[in-house]
């Protein structure tokens, strides 16, 4: 595991959050459309199934991304166990796995934003040192 894996993890987590928003919007649209169509006579069956397929498609995309994230997080967490400074682990976990902004991480940890950025840089370096030692 190296910094690229941390970046990839953050990208996946942000993608999941974004996909969840799209899913919720689509689900609301499908629910509203289905309710509207249920008042109509014929041929709503096919439309209803098409709408269900659309919802299933978005749900499957999210589940696939979540599985990918889980595998990556498991590997990252095992490398975190090798790190001695809990501040570093917390910053990396909040930022890359929790998808928090630096401002949110700083607030959560009670640090200034600039100091949090400095610690994040050091934390990434420490994370990569353990990659070298463990492989």
Predicted region positions:
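N-terminal positioning helix adjacent to the helix-turn-helix/winged-helix DNA-binding module
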Residues: 72, 86-88, 119
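N-terminal functional module detector in eukaryotic proteins
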Residues: 91, 119, 133-135
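Short alpha-helical "recognition helix" segments of helix-turn-helix
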Residues: 104-109
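Short amphipathic alpha helix immediately N-terminal
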Residues: 83-100
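DNA major-groove recognition helices of helix-turn-helix
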Residues: 116-127
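N-terminal interaction/assembly modules
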Residues: 1-80, 125, 129-135
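Short, conserved sequence motifs enriched in acidic/basic residues, glycine, and aromatics
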Residues: 82-83, 110
């Amino acid at each position: 595991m190296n910094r690229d894996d941390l970046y990839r993890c953050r990208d996946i987590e942000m993608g999941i959050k974004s996909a969840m928003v799209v899913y919720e919007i689509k689900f609301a649209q499908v629910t509203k459309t289905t309710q509207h169509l249920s008042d109509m006579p014929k041929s709503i069956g096919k439309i209803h199934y098409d709408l269900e397929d659309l919802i299933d498609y978005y749900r499957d995309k999210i589940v696939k991304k979540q599985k990918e994230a889980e595998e990556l997080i498991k590997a990252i967490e095992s490398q975190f166990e090798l790190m001695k400074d809990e501040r570093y682990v917390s910053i990396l976990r909040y930022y890359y796995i929790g998808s928090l902004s630096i401002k949110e991480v700083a607030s959560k940890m009670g640090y200034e934003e600039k100091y949090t950025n400095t610690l994040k840089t050091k934390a990434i370096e420490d994370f990569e040192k353990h990659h070298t030692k463990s492989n």
